[in-house]
Amino acid sequence: MAEHGKLARLRDLLWQMEVEVGLERLSQPQRDVYYAACLVADADKVLHSEQVRHHPMVETMARPTFYRALKDLVQEGYLVSASEIKNGRYKIAR
């Protein structure tokens, strides 16, 4: 099988998994920010937005797009603020 065929199958598998957990309705920037957040979160699922911002998956994303996606993820309940003050700390909620 050609490499592009393998990649297509892998992408199809990822899409199926996203559908199972409800991520398919997120925009691509929202998904990328969510995945990067999951990758940089500590054992308690806590992360700082700057850690996410500098992850290779999203570091080339425009700042407004990144922060809009982050805000949307909070509004949708995927992330919650980990502090009562605005300090950039979030916790993965689902």
Task: For the regions a language model picked out, list residue spans one by one.
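Short, cationic-aromatic polyanion-contact patches
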Residues: 84-94
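Short amphipathic alpha-helical interaction segments
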Residues: 60-75
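A short, conserved structural fragment
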Residues: 74-84
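Alpha-helix N-cap/helix-initiation sites
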Residues: 23-27, 45-46, 59, 63
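Long, compositionally biased intrinsically disordered regions
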Residues: 1-4, 44
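Short glycine/proline-centered loop/turn elements that form peptide/ligand docking sites
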Residues: 49-50, 67-68, 88
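Short acidic, hydrophobic short linear motifs in intrinsically disordered regions
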Residues: 43-57
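Short alpha-helical segments that sit at the start of domains
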Residues: 4-40
